[in-house]
UniProtKB/Swiss-Prot annotation:
Entry binding sites for substrate: G70, G71, R92, N186
NCBIfam families: argB (TIGR00761)
GO biological process entries: arginine biosynthetic process via ornithine; L-arginine biosynthetic process
Reaction(s) this enzyme catalyzes, per UniProt: N-acetyl-L-glutamate + ATP = N-acetyl-L-glutamyl 5-phosphate + ADP
Protein name in UniProt: Acetylglutamate kinase
Annotated function: Catalyzes the ATP-dependent phosphorylation of N-acetyl-L-glutamate.
Organism phylogeny: Bacteria, Bacillati, Cyanobacteriota, Cyanophyceae, Synechococcales
Family: Belongs to the acetylglutamate kinase family. ArgB subfamily.
């Protein structure tokens, strides 16, 4: 590589850092809740990129909170243990045997893998389940016909405040107990992330998915909608432009925004460093939904 190439690469790095500076200043000390799952969890290179993004966010003074799922690994263990996997209404039907596997995988394996990966990068991560300290109180989902599938009844943010204020990165698995009988329930990780973001009055809720974001035409990746107001997001659901698996994710964003979260983002976790591209660049990626008109005019991110 010649001197001119070195100079061009150095100039590009300086330009990237310069572009990131106002966002670093804006979000220092702010809380960002990240739902981590999908392809970004399944592939080693993407997993490493997500860990580096989260570690960098913490390094520059942002307070990230990570909520994770782990569906593919749960399925692998169910198959290994010859326990049939059943889904109904998009939810995993969870009997007692399945719940044991869910808890083992999410709390005992996936959570520790994320914590170890972040700690290797100096991020000071702490692993928790929703049950720890009563962080998340569960209630049975619907009429109980899905077994030990839960919904969020209450969030106790006091569990996280000391950790965040001392620079730790909470990593939370979406398993929580019902206070009446202490039984563990499997809760959708998007739901937990959204309710945590609202309870912490987070600046941002970020959902890493396996799609580019909200599409005007779900069969056309080029029809990505980059920015929506809360009212527009509701209208897209009503008009069935948002449908299928994107509906609960969009509804999760809407609930978080309605409770005071400034912005919610649906990003393509298959894109390396999607988190940094969304938070620290002018263009961003994915879809941003904003709940306040003035937030949209303050910044594109």
């Amino acid at each position: 590589m010649n001197d001119l190439s070195h100079t061009a690469n150095d100039a590009l790095r300086v330009s990237v850092l310069s572009e990131a500076l106002p966002y670093i200043q804006r979000f220092a000390g702010r809380r960002i809740v990240i739902k981590y799952g999908g392809a970004a969890m399944a592939h080693a290179e993407l997993r490493a990129a997500v860990f580096r993004d989260i570690a960098l966010l913490a390094c520059v003074g942002v307070q990230p909170v990570v909520v994770h799922g782990g569906g593919p690994e749960i399925n692998q263990w169910l198959k290994r243990l010859q326990i049939p996997a059943e889904f109904r209404d998009g939810l995993r039907v969870t009997d007692a045997d399945t719940m044991d596997v869910v808890e083992m995988v999410l709390v005992g394996r996936v959570n520790k893998q994320i914590v170890n990966g972040l700690n290797q990068l100096g991020a000071r991560a702490v692993g928790l389940s929703g049950s720890d300290g009563g962080l998340v109180e569960a209630r049975p989902w619907g009429d109980g016909s899905h077994g030990l599938v839960g919904d969020v009844a209450r969030i106790n943010p006091d569990v996280l405040e000391p950790l965040l204020n001392k620079g730790y990165v909470p990593v939370i698995s979406s398993v929580a107990a019902t206070p009446s009988d202490g039984r563990a329930h499997n809760i959708n990780a998007d739901t937990v992330a959204g309710e945590l973001a609202a309870s912490l009055q987070a600046e941002k809720l970020i959902l890493l998915t396996d799609t580019p974001g909200i599409l005007r035409d779900r069969n056309d990746p080029e029809s990505l909608i980059r920015k929506l107001r809360l009212s527009e997001a509701r209208q897209l659901i009503e008009d069935e432009v948002v449908a299928g698996g994107m509906t609960p994710k969009t509804e999760c964003c809407i609930r978080a925004l309605a409770q005071g979260v400034a912005a919610a983002h649906i990003l393509d976790g298959r894109v390396p460093h999607a988190l940094l591209l969304e938070v620290f660049t002018d263009a961003g990626i994915g879809t941003m939904v904003v709940g306040r008109e003035n937030h949209s005019s303050e910044a594109d991110n």
